[in-house]
Amino acid sequence: MNNFLKRLVLFFSFCVINHAEAARPMLTDDARIVDPKSCQLESWVRDSEHVTEYWALPACNVGENLEVTIGGSLESESGQSSFANELYQMKSIIQPIALNQTGFSIVLGNGRDPKRAMNKAIQDWFLNVPMSYPYNDRLVIHTNLGVTHFTDEHKEKMNWGLSSEYNYNERVDLISEVFNQSSNSTFFQFGLRYWLIKNRAQIDTTYMNSFNRFGEDQSFSVGLRLLSLPFLP
């Protein structure tokens, strides 16, 4: 077994949550990344009235302060399945989050939707600045401000988000947010995260809806998060 395969075995055999908390299942990002030379896997299913989405977003901190994410989704609609989204993203911490200190990070990414514009793959570039403020040892507030360049429309649209994480007890986090991702609708989402095995695996579930078209845009999600020990060279 070569070194690369050994690292893969190490990743999937010894997955363990470290001190960094990822944003999933919230759409509002946080000012955190995974530990140096470590990886994470975020996966979830989102079900709405007409479409079911299956997401997987593996990410690795390839150095000391550069998290790279490459992933996407599969959609099932009217009995037909297709690859719906691709995501390529880099994230770096500007100022780490600490008690009484707001954390800042910067995110640069590229999104592709193969179904748009007569099945031509369209690239949408985005820039986002997540900020995280620890209100106390239980509550953290996150804000996002960013912009997306829509290639086929030749214009830019703003993104924003506001979310909260409340540590209810040693196993449960309560989460909520409002956000707008370059659309005409503002959404809200709330749910919880639960440790299946403390410091090893966590599941989450959420409910999402739109203020503009309440009931028509509602969806539910369930997800699984795993993070690895350091194993990259």
Give each language-model segment a name:
Residues 21-233:
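Transmembrane beta-barrel domains of Gram-negative outer membranes and organellar outer membranes
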Residues 1-27, 231-233:
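Cleavable N-terminal export/targeting peptides
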